């Protein structure tokens, strides 16, 4: 391995080791969230002077889709991560899930049962198609439900094949998975998990317009039972939201 590669790897390990230990909290969160309240939230990453948020206050209520907007570098992705319980030791102000302060909630239970998060660059697991799609599920969904989502997002060629067998390894049918296909898989994971709070970071950046419409229709269909926060630069996605919060 080249010296430069070793140096980069060591620096990355040191960065990870420098991360503060995440507070766990002891309150078991409800899997039915009616409101998220942010009060005077301020945040900047450690070892930087740049303030991403300053005294931000806003509420998110079940039954609504919220678009988080703002220019590049304004902290949109960071804001979703804060609600996801990340970087809480560097946060000032309060974030409450229902009436419980986020800092006092058990973060593992929160992410396992209450919050779902799709990242800008979703990860694919070296495992079966079924396990990739049900990665976030507490209870195993029926094959029929999984297959319906696969067909809805036009992933039959990648994931089903003629045998409709979900227990083959994901990379056996295709050696290369596109960014759009990864985003579709991440969206299906979210839908199968069905968390009370859905956090979607640029979920449509690599999707074709038909798939964008499919996602928006799904979100509108399920929003009555959820709080949905999403980030997107697509005007069509922002317009589909019930409310916008500009950072």
Where are these regions (language model features)?
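Primarily ABC-family ATPase nucleotide-binding module
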Residues: 17-64, 221
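Helix-to-loop junction immediately C-terminal to a conserved catalytic motif
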Residues: 84-85
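Catalytic Walker B motif of ABC-type/P-loop ATPase nucleotide-binding domains
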Residues: 198-202
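Conserved ABC transporter NBD signature motif
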Residues: 92-101, 110
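Conserved "ABC signature" C-loop
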Residues: 122-169
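Cytosolic ends of transmembrane helices, especially the final helix of ABC transmembrane type-1 domains
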Residues: 1-17
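The feature captures the beta-strand-to-loop junction immediately N-terminal to the Walker
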Residues: 69-71
């Amino acid at each position: 391995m080249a010296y430069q590669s070793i140096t980069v790897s060591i620096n990355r390990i040191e960065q990870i080791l420098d991360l503060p230990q995440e507070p766990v909290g002891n309150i078991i969160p409800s899997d039915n969230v009616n409101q998220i309240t942010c009060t005077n939230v301020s945040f900047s990453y450690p070892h930087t002077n740049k303030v991403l948020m300053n005294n931000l206050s806003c509420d998110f209520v079940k039954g609504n889709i919220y678009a988080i907007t703002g220019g590049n570098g304004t902290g949109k992705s960071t804001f979703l991560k804060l609600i996801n319980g990340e970087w809480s030791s560097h946060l000032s102000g309060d974030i409450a899930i229902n009436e419980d302060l986020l800092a006092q909630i058990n973060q593992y239970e929160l992410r396992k049962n209450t919050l779902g998060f799709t990242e800008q660059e979703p990860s694919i697991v070296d495992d079966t198609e079924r396990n990739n799609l049900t990665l976030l599920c507490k209870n195993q969904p029926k094959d029929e439900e999984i297959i319906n989502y696969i067909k809805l997002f036009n992933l039959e060629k990648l994931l089903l094949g003629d045998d409709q067998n979900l227990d083959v390894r994901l990379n056996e049918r295709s050696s290369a998975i596109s960014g759009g296909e990864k985003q579709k898989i991440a969206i299906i994971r979210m839908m199968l998990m069905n968390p009370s709070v859905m956090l979607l970071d640029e979920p449509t950046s690599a999707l074709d317009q038909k798939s964008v419409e499919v996602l928006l229709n799904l979100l509108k269909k399920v929003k009555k039972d959820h709080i949905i926060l999403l980030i997107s630069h697509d005007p069509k996605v922002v317009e589909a939201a019930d409310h916008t919060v500009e950072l």
